A protein has these predicted regions:
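Short amphipathic alpha-helix used as the core "switch/output" element in two-component signaling
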Residues: 51, 76-89
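Alpha4 helix (beta4-alpha4-beta5 surface) of REC/receiver domains from two-component response regulators
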Residues: 18, 22, 77, 100-115, ...
Length: 154
């Protein structure tokens, strides 16, 4: 796996992790989903520290998805840390939380999150969210079809 093949999910609810893994498979996301239980483990993963030191086994992600309310370090802590690390300037971060609080949405945005989505109550709605993730952040842009232009060149 390369860094372009990996998505990092920081989520402490095992049921939500299982649902997310199932939705990834159902949608056919061509990426490895690596799940960590909290913001602290996500930071260790991104640093390549401790059990995550082998980059062949734990490659850098192309996308970070985080819950907000986690036991050790929160999603806010994680976003704040990522924001201070210049090597992660281009890493898109998505918040997927059960919080409906406008202040949480605003703070996540201030800390660099590209999107804030409320965790859906139904699996099919999660599948739709994963489809959006795939389209917007996990599918490389297709090269333009220039065949009609090339046919007109002298």
């Amino acid at each position: 796996m390369t860094e372009h093949d990996t998505v990092l999910l920081a989520e402490d609810d095992e049921n939500d992790v299982l649902l997310f893994q199932t939705a990834f498979k159902k949608v056919g996301v061509p990426k490895l989903l690596v799940c960590v239980p909290d913001g602290e483990d996500a930071i260790e993963y991104l640093k390549g520290a401790g059990i995550y030191s082998n980059r062949m086994e734990y490659p850098l992600p192309c996308l970070l998805i985080t819950d907000l309310k986690m036991v050790k370090r929160t999603g806010f802590d994680l976003l704040e840390w990522v924001q201070t690390q210049t090597q992660f300037n281009g890493l898109p971060a998505i918040v997927l939380s059960s919080s409906l609080e406008e202040s949480d949405k605003r703070r996540a945005s201030e800390l660099g999150a590209q999107a804030y989505w409320v965790k859906p109550a139904h699996f099919e709605d999660l599948v739709e969210l994963v489809c959006l993730l795939k389209e917007k952040w996990l599918t490389p842009p297709q090269p333009a079809d220039l065949s009609s232009i090339q046919n007109r060149l002298p």
